[in-house]
C-alpha cells in the first residue's frame, strides 16, 4: 500500500496556489527582522560617537567636538529603519493572512464538494458534531496555526541567525558567550513545554466534557426538572469544574515557569556580557556603543527561542486537525455505476428481486427479499425496531447498494442509472421536517426551482397549509430559521408535503410523517397525504396503523423478512403479527378513551 504523504506536505498542495503571496510575505518578514536586528548596532554608532567626543570634551582635549552631521545621519538611518520595519511587519501579515484565508476557503469548498460525493453510510458511522467540528474548528485551527506559525518560524530562524552573525562580528569573546546561552535557553523552554503539554491536553479534554455536559443538560432541561435531578446534576457539574480547575492550574503553573527560567538565563548571560564587556571597554577593545548593542542582543535572542518552543504544541495541534480534515477528503466517493441517464419519465413500477443486504460483513439484515409494486400503489411497511424498514428505503433510494440481487424501477437496474436523475424521481416527507434558513417560498421551491408563484400557492392549498402561511407575518416571504417557534412540527410537515407536491415526484417516501402531532393536525396531514399520493407509487413507514389502513399492500417485516403481506382487512383476518399489533394499539386507545 502506498504510504500517504505528510499532512503538511499535502497542505502545501493547497497553499502553493498562493505561493507568490507567501513568498512576498516571507521576504517582507525577513526585511522586518533585518531592520529589528540592526537597530542595536545603529544606536551603538550614535552612542559611540557621543560618548567618545563628550569624554574628550570633558577632559578638555583640543578640537574635541561632536560630529553633529554624523549623528544626524545615523538618526535618519535609524528612523528610516523603523519605517521599513513597520511596513515589513504589517504587509507580511497582510499578504500571509490573505493567502491563508484564500487557501482555507479552497479547503472548505473541497470539504463541501466531498460531503456531496461520499456515501450516506459515512454519516451513519460518524457523529454530526464530529463532522461539524472538522468543517469549523479543525479548519480554523489550521488557519490560525499556519497564519501565525509560519511567519513566527521565519522570524525566529532569521532573528537567531542574524543575531549570531552580529555578535560574532562585534566581538568574538562576547559573541561566543551569547551563542552558548542559546542551547541552554532552548533546552529549558523545551523541558517546560514538555512537562506542561499533558496538562494542557487534559485541560482541553475536560473542557470538552464540560461543554458536552452543559449542552446535554440544556437540551434535556425539562426532563431534568421533571425527575428532580437538579442537585445531582449540579454535583456532577462541580466535579467537572473542579477537575478543570486542577488541571488548568497545573498547566498554567508549569507553563508560567517559562518566562522566569528564560529571564534567569538571560540575566546570567547579561551579567557575563556586562562584566566581560566592561573590562573590554576599559581596555579599549570594545566601544560603549557596541557594548549596549550586546546587551540588547542578549534580550533579543530570548523571544524567538520561546516562540519556537511554544510552536511545537501549536503545530502538533494543527497536524491533528489537518489529519481529521484529510480523513474526510480521503473518503471514497459514492460508486457511480454505469451512470445511464433517464430518457423517459418513470411510471413508478418497483421490483425487489432476491435482494440480500448487510451493513456488517457476515451479519445479513435482509435475505432473499422479493417485492413487486405497481405504479400508483401505496405500500405500507411495519414491523418492530430493527426489522429492516428504514434499510429497505435506503436501498430503494440507493443510499446503499444491495449485496446480492437487484432493485429495478420500470425495468431499470437502479445501479445502472445516474444517481442524480434517479433521485429526482423521489419525494420525501419525514417525521423530522427539514426546513432550511430562508423564506417559506424558497423552502417550498427547494425541489423545483422553476416553480412559479401560482404553482407554489396551488401546492400549498393541496397540502392544506395555504391558510396558515397567509396568517404568518410576511406570508410566503416570511424568513424561516431553526428557532421558528411560531411553526409547530405538524405545520412543518404540511410544508414538506407542499414541497413534495411541487416537486411532482413519481415515487414517494413517507417516514413517520404523522407521528407526534395533535389529532386536528393529523387529519389535515392525512388529507394532504391523500392529495400527495394520488397517482404516485408510495412507500409508507408508520407505527400508527390507523394511517395505513387504505394501503394497497402492507408488508410486515421481521429480521429483514416479509412475514406477512396483504391489505388491512386480510391481515386482520389472518390474526398474525399485524393483528396483534393492531389490537394492541386499538386497546390502548380504548383505555385512553375510558
Q: Which residues fall in each region the model found?
A:
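Cytosolic ends of transmembrane helices, especially the final helix of ABC transmembrane type-1 domains
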Residues: 229, 253, 270, 294, ...
Amino acid at each position: 500500500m502506498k504510504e500517504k504523504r505528510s499532512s503538511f506536505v499535502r497542505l502545501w498542495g493547497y497553499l502553493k496556489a498562493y505561493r507568490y503571496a507567501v513568498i512576498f510575505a516571507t521576504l517582507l518578514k525577513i526585511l522586518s527582522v533585518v531592520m529589528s536586528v540592526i537597530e542595536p548596532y545603529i544606536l551603538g554608532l550614535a552612542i559611540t560617537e557621543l560618548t567618545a567626543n563628550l569624554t574628550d570634551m570633558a577632559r578638555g582635549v583640543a578640537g574635541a567636538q561632536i560630529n553633529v552631521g554624523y549623528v544626524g545621519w545615523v538618526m535618519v538611518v535609524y528612523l528610516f529603519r523603523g519605517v521599513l520595519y513597520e511596513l515589513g511587519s504589517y504587509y507580511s501579515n497582510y499578504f500571509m493572512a490573505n493567502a491563508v484565508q484564500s487557501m482555507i476557503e479552497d479547503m472548505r469548498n473541497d470539504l463541501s464538494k466531498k460531503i456531496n460525493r461520499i456515501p450516506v453510510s459515512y454519516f451513519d458511522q460518524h457523529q454530526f458534531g464530529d463532522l461539524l467540528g472538522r468543517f469549523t474548528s479543525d479548519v480554523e485551527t489550521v488557519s490560525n496555526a499556519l497564519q501565525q506559525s509560519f511567519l513566527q518560524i521565519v522570524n525566529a530562524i532569521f532573528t537567531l541567525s542574524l543575531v549570531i552573525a552580529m555578535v560574532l562580528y562585534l566581538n568574538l569573546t562576547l559573541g561566543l558567550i551569547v551563542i552558548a546561552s542559546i542551547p541552554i535557553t532552548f533546552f529549558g523552554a523545551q523541558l517546560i513545554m514538555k512537562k506542561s503539554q499533558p496538562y494542557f491536553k487534559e485541560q482541553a479534554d475536560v473542557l470538552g466534557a464540560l461543554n458536552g455536559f452543559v449542552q446535554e443538560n440544556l437540551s434535556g432541561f425539562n426532563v431534568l426538572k421533571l425527575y428532580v435531578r437538579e442537585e445531582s446534576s449540579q454535583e456532577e457539574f462541580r466535579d467537572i469544574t473542579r477537575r478543570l480547575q486542577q488541571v488548568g492550574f497545573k498547566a498554567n503553573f508549569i507553563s508560567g515557569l517559562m518566562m522566569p527560567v528564560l529571564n534567569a538565563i538571560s540575566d546570567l548571560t547579561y551579567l557575563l556580557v556586562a562584566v566581560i564587556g566592561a573590562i573590554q571597554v576599559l581596555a579599549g577593545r570594545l566601544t560603549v556603543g557596541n557594548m549596549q548593542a550586546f546587551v540588547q542582543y542578549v534580550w533579543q535572542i530570548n523571544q524567538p527561542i520561546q516562540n519556537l518552543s511554544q510552536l511545537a504544541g501549536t503545530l502538533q495541534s494543527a497536524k491533528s486537525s489537518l489529519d481529521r480534515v484529510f480523513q474526510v477528503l480521503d473518503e471514497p466517493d459514492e460508486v457511480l455505476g454505469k451512470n445511464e441517464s433517464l430518457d423517459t419519465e418513470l411510471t413508478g413500477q418497483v421490483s425487489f428481486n432476491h435482494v440480500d443486504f448487510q451493513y456488517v460483513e457476515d451479519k445479513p439484515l435482509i435475505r432473499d427479499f422479493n417485492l413487486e409494486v405497481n405504479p400508483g400503489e401505496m405500500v405500507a411497511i411495519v414491523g418492530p425496531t430493527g426489522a429492516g424498514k428504514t434499510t429497505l428505503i435506503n436501498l430503494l433510494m440507493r443510499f446503499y447498494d444491495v449485496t446480492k440481487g437487484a432493485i429495478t424501477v420500470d425495468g431499470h437496474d437502479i445501479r445502472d442509472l445516474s444517481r442524480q436523475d434517479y433521485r429526482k424521481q423521489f419525494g420525501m416527507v419525514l417525521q423530522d421536517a427539514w426546513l432550511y434558513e430562508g423564506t417559506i417560498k424558497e423552502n417550498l421551491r427547494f425541489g423545483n426551482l422553476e416553480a412559479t408563484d401560482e404553482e407554489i400557492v396551488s401546492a400549498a392549498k393541496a397540502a392544506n397549509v395555504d391558510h396558515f402561511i397567509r396568517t404568518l407575518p410576511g406570508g410566503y416571504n416570511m424568513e424561516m430559521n431553526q428557532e421558528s417557534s411560531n411553526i409547530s412540527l405538524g405545520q412543518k410537515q404540511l410544508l414538506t408535503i407542499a414541497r413534495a407536491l411541487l416537486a411532482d415526484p413519481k415515487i414517494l417516501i413517507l417516514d413517520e410523517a404523522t407521528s407526534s402531532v395533535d389529532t386536528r393536525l393529523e387529519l389535515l396531514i392525512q388529507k394532504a397525504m391523500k392529495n400527495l399520493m394520488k397517482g404516485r407509487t408510495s412507500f409508507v413507514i408508520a407505527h400508527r396503523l390507523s394511517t395505513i389502513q387504505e394501503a394497497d399492500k402492507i408488508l410486515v417485516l421481521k429480521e429483514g423478512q416479509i412475514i406477512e403481506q396483504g391489505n388491512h382487512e386480510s391481515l386482520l383476518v389472518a390474526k398474525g403479527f399485524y393483528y396483534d399489533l393492531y389490537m394492541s394499539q386499538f386497546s390502548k386507545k380504548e383505555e385512553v378513551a375510558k
